């Protein structure tokens, strides 16, 4: 037998037992007549002692080096009281080695486990990076999450059904990864961006509770929390309303937090998209940050200051204030840095006002814009934002979107910089009632979620007549500023689906070509259905306390969508390309 126990599982209950351990040398210390090693496996680390009492094992241990793969047979003994290590889970015991077997020696590692290695090094030698205890713990947590989800889904009557990986390209927002067909030369499969249409078809097939933990693929520009291939917890239901779907999914996430880290998330508040954007400048607000945006256009619309009065009198403009309690200590240099920061989001500047004495009216205000205000305007502003002595007010004034984006980002930055964001808290919520459509860069209407989301209380005729007023029957789950899941009630009326396609500029010929199978299926007694998808990678990232999504994926890609370890992507064999009838054009 190669193993009877895991290293990290040993404790006082094992004292006196003979055990067989298999793992790696984490650290070695030679104290003359004795040799100690820390031995590591996926469960943790235990100290092993080599004593002259077992001379063969002691002699063999002299040749051990870090990362040798070994087997130890020995007895679990109590550490002397003065040698107990309270920083180790196994710190009350050690193993007295009786036999040592070296499975395999190790070259000097290209990574130093005791130093900060570059991410490039870590990804190139990922199989070594995963030996680090913190990385092993993250993947164990990920496995625990998926195990919990499967149990929950099974207990709640959901069926785990697989959907195809080789499918048809459909416009879902990002670019598809294409797979050429050898049999059908010149044609391509697409790797799925999500199982969206297949899970809707399963509802039409009568499987009223479906789930799947599934790989999805998107060929898009990457950020720190994005990967070209990622994993979704995909869910769809029939005959449930949006609140009922949210209730089930909230129970799942509530239970997941309790099971994984012992945290009770409490009841999730529900907030409309409009309120989230108005108060926090984001559709995924981080409620750990106490700062809020307050609209003041009605107060400043008549001031002799174009920066304020123009957007205040423009239906598409916005003037908003963030009050920072005790922020008057912020220096002019810091204010200049914040002004530069909001410029990234298109803001032309950042007005500010320090409240040196709230009881002194305008006389108590230090601000370059004070000369444009009068006592009534200042009184209105101070009352609206509840200004106090020692505060600073930051003003954003521009088009609605620019002000909202810039001030929303400033709110987050102020929260971090000033230590206002309560990092020890968990703040979940649901965001609902998103706009059905938004304008893209060319000014055309695009679906804010996807084109299969149902509008709320709109007929097809009303939707076609006034699409920009429509509210989507959609919902996102947000935790600490991260969107961890999103879903909607789906369109189940063929006329409504065709109307949405037309609004999005997809004519009847394109509808038949791209979605003919869906439009046909909608004709045959389609049930009302709704669903949701969680990002497993992002959930794991939150539950393990890392800010890098690559830390919770065993073999991730870089931000350039490359695998440094296997050197993928690579050039294809010319013979394989010939069989596929593909010629490669040299990139310019």
From Swiss-Prot:
This is Aspartate--tRNA ligase. NCBIfam families: aspS_bact (TIGR00459), PRK00476.1 (NF001750). GO terms for molecular function: aspartate-tRNA ligase activity; ATP binding; nucleic acid binding. Its EC number is 6.1.1.12. Belongs to the class-II aminoacyl-tRNA synthetase family. Type 1 subfamily. ATP binds at residues 218-220, 227, 483, 535-538. L-aspartate binds at residues 172, 218, 449, 490. It comes from the Bacteria. It catalyses: tRNA(Asp) + L-aspartate + ATP = L-aspartyl-tRNA(Asp) + AMP + diphosphate. GO terms for biological process: aspartyl-tRNA aminoacylation. Coiled coil: none annotated. InterPro entries: Aa-tRNA-synt_II, aa-tRNA-synth_II, aa-tRNA-synth_II/BPL/LPL, Asp-tRNA-ligase_1, Asp-tRNA-ligase_1_N, Asp/Asn-tRNA-synth_IIb, AspRS_core, GAD-like_sf. Homodimer. HAMAP family: Asp_tRNA_synth_type1. It is an enzyme of class 6 (ligase). One of its GO terms (cellular component) is cytoplasm. Disulfide bonds: none annotated.
């Amino acid at each position: 037998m190669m193993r009877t126990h895991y290293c990290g599982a040993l404790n006082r209950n094992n004292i006196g037992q003979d055990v067989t351990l298999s793992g790696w040398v984490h650290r070695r210390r030679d104290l003359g007549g004795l040799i100690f090693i820390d031995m590591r496996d996926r469960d943790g680390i235990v100290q092993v002692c080599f004593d002259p009492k077992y001379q063969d094992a002691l002699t063999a241990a002299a040749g051990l080096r870090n990362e040798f793969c070994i087997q130890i047979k020995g007895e679990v003994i109590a550490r002397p009281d003065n040698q107990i290590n309270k920083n180790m889970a196994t710190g009350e015991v050690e193993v007295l080695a009786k036999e040592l077997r070296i499975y395999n020696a190790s070259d000097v590692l290209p990574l130093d486990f005791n130093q900060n290695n570059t991410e490039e090094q870590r990804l190139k030698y990922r199989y070594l990076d995963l030996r680090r205890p913190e990385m092993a713990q993250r993947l164990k947590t990920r496995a625990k999450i998926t195990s919990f989800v499967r149990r929950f889904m099974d207990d709640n009557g959901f069926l785990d059904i697989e959907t195809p990986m080789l499918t048809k390209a459909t416009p879902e927002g990002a670019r598809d990864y294409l797979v050429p067909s050898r049999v059908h030369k010149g044609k391509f499969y697409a790797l799925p961006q999500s199982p969206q249409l297949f899970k809707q078809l399963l509802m039409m097939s009568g499987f009223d509770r479906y789930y799947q933990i599934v790989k999805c693929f998107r060929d898009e520009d990457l950020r720190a929390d994005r990967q070209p291939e990622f994993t979704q917890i995909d869910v769809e239901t029939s005959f449930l309303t949006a609140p009922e779907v949210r209730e089930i999914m909230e129970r799942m996430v509530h239970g997941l937090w309790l099971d994984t880290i012992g945290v009770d998330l409490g009841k999730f508040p529900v907030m409309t998209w409009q309120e989230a954007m108005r108060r926090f400048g984001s559709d995924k607000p981080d409620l750990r940050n106490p700062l809020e945006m307050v609209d003041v256009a009605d107060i400043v619309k008549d001031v002799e200051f174009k920066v304020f009065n123009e957007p205040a009198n423009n239906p598409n403009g916005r003037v908003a204030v963030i009050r920072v309690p005790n922020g008057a200590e912020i220096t002019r240099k810091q204010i200049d840095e914040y002004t530069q920061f909001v410029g990234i989001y298109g803001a032309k500047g950042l007005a500010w006002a320090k409240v040196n004495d709230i009881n002194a009216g305008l006389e108590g205000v230090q601000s370059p814009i004070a000369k444009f205000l009068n006592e009534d305007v200042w009184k209105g502003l101070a009352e609206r934002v509840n200004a106090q002595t020692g505060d600073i007010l930051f003003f954003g004034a521009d088009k609605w979107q620019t002000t909202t984006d810039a001030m929303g980002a400033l709110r987050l930055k102020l929260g971090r910089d000033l230590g206002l964001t309560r990092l020890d808290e968990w703040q979940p919520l649901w965001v609902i009632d998103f706009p059905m459509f938004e304008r893209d860069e060319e000014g055309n209407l695009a679906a804010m979620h996807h084109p299969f989301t149902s509008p709320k209380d709109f007929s097809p005729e009303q939707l076609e007549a006034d699409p920009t007023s429509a509210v989507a029957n959609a919902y996102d789950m947000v935790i600490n500023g991260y969107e961890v899941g999103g879903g909607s009630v789906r369109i189940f009326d063929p006329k409504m689906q065709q109307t949405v396609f037309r609004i999005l500029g997809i004519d009847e010929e394109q509808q038949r070509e791209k979605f003919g199978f869906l439009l046909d299926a909608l004709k045959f007694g389609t049930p009302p259905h709704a669903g949701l998808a969680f990002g497993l990678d992002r959930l794991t990232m939150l539950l393990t306390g890392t800010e890098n999504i690559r830390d919770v994926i065993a073999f991730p890609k870089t931000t350039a969508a490359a695998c440094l370890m296997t050197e993928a992507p690579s050039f294809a064999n010319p013979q394989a390309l010939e069989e596929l009838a593909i010629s490669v054009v040299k990139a310019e």
